[in-house]
Design a protein with these regions (language model features):
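C-terminal/domain-terminus segments
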Residues: 94-103, 112
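Conserved beta-to-alpha transition
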Residues: 108-109, 124
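Acidic, glycine-centered active-site loop in nucleotide-sugar glycosyltransferases
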Residues: 109, 114-117
């Protein structure tokens, strides 16, 4: 994995191989960042955030078959609230994800998102 300058990673965080975390980002405790995740600069990942790369596309776990995994890309200046779940998506720059949200689709416009599934609440 690659972790940029001036980052903070809290206790009990699992960061799997191949993950990229940009400079000045913070990852709070008990978060899980699986393979194929890239996080931009100046991001905040709250406590207990889970990133998922296996969508169980054929009704069962990929069982290590990486061809079934999908990537997640988080832009710059993104804040993700505690206990959010991020499926394989692209999140643009300047986004806030509320605590407990489940992000199931790409986020292409800056703003505040929350809920299950996450939806846009407002612009900045």
């Amino acid at each position: 994995c690659s972790i940029g300058d001036a980052c903070f990673v809290g206790p009990f965080v699992e960061i799997q191989k191949g993950v990229s975390i940009g400079a000045h980002s913070k990852v709070q405790s008990h978060s899980f960042i699986c393979e194929l995740v890239s996080i931009g600069e100046h991001c905040f990942i709250g406590h207990g955030v889970m990133f998922v790369n296996d969508l169980f596309s054929d009704g069962q776990a990929a069982q290590g078959d990486k061809s079934k995994w999908k990537a997640t890309h988080i832009g710059h200046h993104v804040s993700i609230g505690s206990n959010a779940t991020i499926l394989p998506v692209r999140i643009c720059d300047q986004v806030v994800i509320g605590a407990g949200a489940v992000v199931t689709k790409d986020i292409t416009e800056p703003g505040v998102y929350a809920g299950n599934p996450a939806r846009k609440l407002r612009d900045f």
